[in-house]
Each structure stands twice: as C-alpha cells, then as structure tokens.
C-alpha cells in the first residue's frame, strides 16, 4: 500500500531574526511528528523564513522613489508599498481586482465569512501586480501584509533556494537525517477563484519529475510525466498551513518517493528568452489559425 503522511507543526512562539529556525523545527518535530526522519520533505512558509532573514519592512521607514510616487497616484497604492513592488522585480501585468469585485461581487461574497472585511481588504489592495521575480510571476512580487504587525509587511527571501539549502544543512547537522526542504508561498490562481501554495525555493528534491515521454500503461510515449513536485508538496502542506490564524507554518511530508537533487526551484523556471519566444510563437500561430479558419469557409 502506498501512503504519504503530512504532519503540521504548530508554532506559537514569535519568530524574528534571532530565531534559530532549523533548531525550532527539529524541536517541534520531536513533539509533533515523531522527530525528523530520512527522506522527510520539510515544507516551510516563506513568511517564517522572511522573518528570520530580516525581510520584514516597516512601511514608514521606506523612502519611495519618484517612480513609486508616480505609479501610486494612478493605482491608489501607498507609495511605500509601490516602492517595495518595484524593488522586487519587473511588473509584468496589473489586475484591477477592485473593479472586478464591483462587477462580480457575488464571487467574493460566496467565499467570505465577512462581507465587510472582504470589502475592506479589496479597498486596501485595489490592484494585483504580477511581478517577475527571477523568472517567476508572483502576486505583488511576494510582498505580503498578512500576519505582520500593522504598518509592516514582508518580502520573500532574497534567494529562496539558498535559504532552503541552509536550513536543510542545519537540520542534517542537528539530526543526522537526509531531508529535502521546500519554501512555499501563496499565489492567486488565474484560471479559477482561489489561492494555492507554490514553491519558491527548494533543496534536496528534484523540482520537476523527469519522465517526459515515458511509456504509459499501453507502452506508448506519453506527452507529460513532468510533475512539478515542489509545487505539489507545497499545495499539500497548505492543507495544514491555512491562511489566517492556524499558526502552522511548517509541515513534514513523510513517505513521498522522490529523486534527490541539489537543483532548486529557480533551475526549473523558464529562461526569459524562452518566455519571449513562446509568446511570439503563440501570437503567430493564432494569427495563422484565424486566417486558415477564414479560408476554410471559402473552400
């Protein structure tokens, strides 16, 4: 019988730059998941890693640039927050979430326990900025205001793969166990209403399964077999993380079969040139298809 277990580690202590995160994880695992075992996948929310690495910002201490002031006027976003977005990466797209909520309010009302609170948070964040951070599109560039004190926010770790590697090394020193570490962050889904946790950093696990073209049950090469394992374990851990006051920022996934690797999430991202070529080819092929569709009506 194949089985995978997920243990959520509840952490009630305040976490800051003085916290020894690997030791804290090991101590909590002893009490809540029978310790750390070989081949465990330790999934950690990015917010916790950001707090330890000093990536929490006090908004009134940020000096906005002229560019940030300029954009903030058009997008009703505090210039300090706008400055952080611009620092994190290049803004690729802007989603007018408040306008969409005004037009399709029933979608938001169906998935909230407090209509008043939902309206308040949308007023505070009327636009979602999709920002290219190391070849990955992240909402607001990973800048997050939740579970931070008023007037504060957190940015994702500067180098999530390196953060995952360091934590993995420290866990190995403390326990003698070989594990994998994945750092997860919450992202809005663009194809349906809702959010899901995705991996922004990893160490010790092959991020993408290497089975493209492998034979299926009928012996035919399959167009597929490239599961995004780090995203899958992040989404699985999110079942226990929650999004509000669960105080469960770490999960241990046990029993998962995976290929060990020193590669990280950044290694699995599409190169920028591939992005540009894909868009160009997409546009050209769609123009071609539209023209052929018109011609097919003539013949």
Stretches found by the model and what they are:
Residues 1-299:
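N-terminal and secondary-structure boundary signal
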């Amino acid at each position: 019988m194949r089985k995978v277990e997920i243990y959520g580690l509840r952490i009630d202590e305040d976490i800051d730059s003085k916290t020894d995160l690997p030791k804290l994880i090991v101590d909590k695992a002893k009490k809540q998941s029978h310790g750390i075992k070989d081949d465990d996948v330790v999934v950690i929310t990015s917010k916790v890693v950001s707090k330890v690495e000093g990536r929490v910002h006090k908004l009134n201490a940020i000096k906005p640039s002229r560019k940030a002031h300029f954009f903030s006027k058009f997008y009703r976003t505090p210039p300090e927050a706008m400055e952080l977005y611009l620092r994190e990466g290049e803004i690729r797209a802007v989603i007018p979430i408040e306008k969409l909520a005004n037009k399709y309010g029933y979608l938001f009302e169906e998935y909230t326990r407090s209509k008043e609170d939902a309206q308040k948070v949308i007023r505070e964040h009327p636009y979602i900025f999709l920002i290219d951070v190391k070849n990955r599109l992240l909402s607001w560039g990973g800048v997050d205001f939740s579970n931070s004190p008023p007037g504060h926010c957190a940015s994702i770790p500067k180098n999530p793969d390196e953060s995952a590697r360091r934590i993995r090394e420290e866990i190995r020193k403390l326990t003698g166990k070989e594990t994998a570490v994945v750092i997860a962050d919450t992202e809005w889904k663009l194809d349906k209403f809702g959010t899901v946790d995705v991996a922004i950093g990893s160490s010790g696990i092959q991020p993408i399964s290497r089975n493209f073209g492998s034979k299926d049950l009928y012996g035919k090469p399959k167009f597929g077999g490239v599961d995004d394992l780090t995203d899958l374990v992040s989404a699985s851990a999110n079942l226990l993380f929650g999004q509000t006051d669960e105080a469960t920022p770490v999960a241990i996934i046990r029993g998962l079969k995976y290929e060990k690797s020193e590669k990280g999430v950044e290694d699995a991202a599409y190169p920028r040139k591939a992005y540009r070529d894909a868009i160009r080819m997409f546009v050209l092929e769609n123009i071609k298809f539209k023209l052929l569709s018109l011609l097919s009506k003539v013949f």
